[in-house]
């Protein structure tokens, strides 16, 4: 979420978690192409093994993905979500949740028909902010996908199972309503749930309370880089032996008047009200800002040892990640891409992956004037040859889901690995000349993914990159 023209205030760099560098050698093996439409995948990198960096081999430190859950503008089912993406369908429409007629931007990736039935009881359904509802539903669906739904969760050591689901904005509806009650009716009319349901850590807390998970539990809030920060931190808890399993990702529900108005005030949003479905057009010369989205994307991450011991359905492997800061500007990215390129390089180092092994990038690609090209410049610094790499933009269809963006995009990345199909970047009408990658324009493409990276960047100059591949024993 970068690329505004604002004041020259400088952001301070974050203090990211650092992973211990206890690495062992790993011999890469090339396998056949995966079966299409299956959750399990056994692709591996096809690059030469002679000079490849060292990958983790210790099953206690290898981190695998065993479950995925989401709430999205395309519904709450992972397979249905990816089918919509593959078909190139736009989830963007005019906002009808409130009267947006006086806003210069009147559209977004608004979720409709959401139901938490079977996941949240009626009393909490009425009280909870949508941000919290999305977190709980996506988290429980991820556990079901990991074969840990219901009583099956009692088969693991809950003292070593944690939750790390972040959010950029927190319970914005609850916060907005609390302020309105204070102004209009006085402090006595503020709900006792105002503070608990507005703070950013409550999604992780409520999910853990509901499920009895006593492992590491907190949230990270780094704007639109939030989900990837959570994946990175969760994996490090596993690698350090502090957890066997982590539920990690992001959640967001900011399509309300104060959320829309705030981003309008930042001059961040597209104003293509006459044609909302073509408004999110990353890398297109006519792009005019990002489109707000909402939802949640959550992964179940486990040590390989723990997953194998319980016979878990392994859908991919988390190879590594990195986080850093541009230390440049509150909202604008560095034009030279140095922060992002450094983050990508550190991610590959952490993953034990050479640049030549990466052949798919799920880009941050928000459809902003400065941000899209800054990311491309950064990618070119790391990957000297662009011919073998395909890049796509999930946000072209679902909008920018802020703190949940990386979670929903990680799921799209894993599905690309599993299926051998990349979803298109839609609304590619007149691409920037500098974008000489294959952006999978307007139509899906079949592509065997060796190693994928997923980029997420946020206000404050927060950069995050995570790497995935098919799991291979």
Swiss-Prot record:
Keywords: Acyltransferase, Chloroplast, Fatty acid biosynthesis, Fatty acid metabolism, Lipid biosynthesis, Lipid metabolism, Plastid, Transferase, Transit peptide. The keyword Transport does not apply. Residues 1-46 form a transit peptide. Its EC number is 2.3.1.41. Disulfide bonds: none annotated. Belongs to the thiolase-like superfamily. Beta-ketoacyl-ACP synthases family. This is 3-oxoacyl-[acyl-carrier-protein] synthase I, chloroplastic.
């Amino acid at each position: 979420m970068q690329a505004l023209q604002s004041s020259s205030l400088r952001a301070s760099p974050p203090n990211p978690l650092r992973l211990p560098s206890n690495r062992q050698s790993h011999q890469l093996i090339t396998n056949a192409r995966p079966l299409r439409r299956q959750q399990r995948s056994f692709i591996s990198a096809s690059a030469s093994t002679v000079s490849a960096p060292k990958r983790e081999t210790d099953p206690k430190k290898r981190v695998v993905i065993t479950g995925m859950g989401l709430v999205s503008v395309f519904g709450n089912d992972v397979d249905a979500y990816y089918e919509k993406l593959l078909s190139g369908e736009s989830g963007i429409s005019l906002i009808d949740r409130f009267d947006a007629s006086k806003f210069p931007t009147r559209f977004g990736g608004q979720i409709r028909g959401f139901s938490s039935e079977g996941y949240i009881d009626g009393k909490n359904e009425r009280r909870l902010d949508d941000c919290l509802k999305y977190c709980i539903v996506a988290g429980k669906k991820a556990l079901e996908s990991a074969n840990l739904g219901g009583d099956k969760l009692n088969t693991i050591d809950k003292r070593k199972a944690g939750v790390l689901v972040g959010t950029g904005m927190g319970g914005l509806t609850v916060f907005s309503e609390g302020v309105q009650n204070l102004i209009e009716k006085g402090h006595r009319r503020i709900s006792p749930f105002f503070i608990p349901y507005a703070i950013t850590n409550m999604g992780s807390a409520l999910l853990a309370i509901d499920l009895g998970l006593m492992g590491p539990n907190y949230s990270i809030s780094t704007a639109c880089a939030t989900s990837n920060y959570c994946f990175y931190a969760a994996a490090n808890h596993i690698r350090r032996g502090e957890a066997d399993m982590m539920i990690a990702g992001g959640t967001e529900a900011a399509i309300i008047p104060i959320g829309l108005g705030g981003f309008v005030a930042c001059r961040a949003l597209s104003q293509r009200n006459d044609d909302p479905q073509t408004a999110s057009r990353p890398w297109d010369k006519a792009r005019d800002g990002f489109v707000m989205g909402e939802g949640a994307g959550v992964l179940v991450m486990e040590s390989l040892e723990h997953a194998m011991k319980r016979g878990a359905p392994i859908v991919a492997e988390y190879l590594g990640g990195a986080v850093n800061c541009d230390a440049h500007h509150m909202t604008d990215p560095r034009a030279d891409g140095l922060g992002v390129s450094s983050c990508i390089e550190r991610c590959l180092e952490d993953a034990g992956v050479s640049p030549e092994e990466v052949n798919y990038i799920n880009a941050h690609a928000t459809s902003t004037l400065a941000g899209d090209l800054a990311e491309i410049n950064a990618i070119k610094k790391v990957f000297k040859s662009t011919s073998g790499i395909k890049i796509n933009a999930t946000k072209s269809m679902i909008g920018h889901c802020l703190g949940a963006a990386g979670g929903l995009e990680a799921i799209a990345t894993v599905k690309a690995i599993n299926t051998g199909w990349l979803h298109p970047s839609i609304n590619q009408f007149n691409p920037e000349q500098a974008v000489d990658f294959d952006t999978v324009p307007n139509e899906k493409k079949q592509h065997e993914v060796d190693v994928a990276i997923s980029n997420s960047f946020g206000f404050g100059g927060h950069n995050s990159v995570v790497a995935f591949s098919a799991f291979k024993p």
